[in-house]
From Swiss-Prot:
Keywords associated with the record: Cytoplasm, Elongation factor, GTP-binding, Hydrolase, Magnesium, Metal-binding, Nucleotide-binding, Protein biosynthesis
Keyword GTP-binding assigned: yes
Gene3D superfamilies named in the record: P-loop containing nucleotide triphosphate hydrolases (3.40.50.300), Translation factors (2.40.30.10)
Family statement: Belongs to the TRAFAC class translation factor GTPase superfamily. Classic translation factor GTPase family. EF-Tu/EF-1A subfamily.
Protein name: Elongation factor Tu 1
Gene it is expressed from: tuf1
Native species: Rhizobium etli (strain ATCC 51251 / DSM 11541 / JCM 21823 / NBRC 15573 / CFN 42)
Stretch list, region G4: 131-134
Amino acid sequence: MAKSKFERNKPHVNIGTIGHVDHGKTSLTAAITKYFGEFKAYDQIDAAPEEKARGITISTAHVEYETPARHYAHVDCPGHADYVKNMITGAAQMDGAILVCSAADGPMPQTREHILLARQVGVPAIVVFLNKVDQVDDAELLELVELEVRELLSSYDFPGDDIPVVKGSALAALEDSDKKIGEDAIRELMAAVDSYIPTPERPVDQPFLMPIEDVFSISGRGTVVTGRVERGIIKVGEEVEIVGIRPTSKTTVTGVEMFRKLLDQGQAGDNIGALIRGVNRDGVERGQILCKPGSVKPHKKFKAEAYILTKEEGGRHTPFFTNYRPQFYFRTTDVTGIVTLPEGTEMVMPGDNVTVDVELIVPIAMEEKLRFAIREGGRTVGAGIVASIVE
């Protein structure tokens, strides 16, 4: 399907609002669009459409806006479960997050949970909006809440002392009732987001990686592997490694084609066929990757943050225990893995999110923040992300 070309001279950043239920995430999202985008009312954002990511249904609202410096895509979720699913599946990638915390309540259970999730799924930076400051008349109390939020962030390895904390009222901004804590605070918040949340490196500037989807042998020319380039650029004549499942091997890309035309290079986002030198048709398989030599290693053991589907979502009807052996679907292939639950966790119920240890039966090209689906016989029963690699 032809889409209109996305032309923009400003850097693009994906962000989202996180925080406890009813602390004002959606009101803040609405307030930002009021000054920086095409205004979206609370109800328009709150009625988030459902979408599917990795076989999981998630309600997510997307808005866009821009500051003089950047263009933003912003995601807001109606329910806590949607946040968990969103962050784990990466349905809406976050380059940074705005943590919304009510000054009247201080940090609450989901404040903590969203910060932990942000840490586990590798959200690089957080900016804090202390909302509802008009409900707190004591300046000392306000300082205490700010301190509490900073300490909470530090306890999850975010730089709590350096993170910008902006105090204001999303409602005051929406109702134009108090400019200082309304409009001024929203403008101050976006200035902080502009300066504190780093611009992500564009996929095309990262080291080359292409998951292999298919392998063909073309008589007289050799072996062709096809797939969509995940990141970076591959030029004809460059050396690459084939990583995962089998021992890592090196080869040279002797041709790149797209839509049956020969190119001198393929780049992030392109669906290409790459002709590789000196590799037999059976020397390479789906589920391996082509990558820049030395950039990615194969691993079997990792810690993961996972969300397990409920029965209603098409998931399991029963809990699972340590030594559970489902398939882990990484990029283009399923690999069986053995799950070990954390100490003190007897079982995992459908609908839970959990940190687990996994050992795959064969090594897979893997990095932190790589996403996967958990499947049983081809049916998705969960989603996860590699939180850290063990070996």
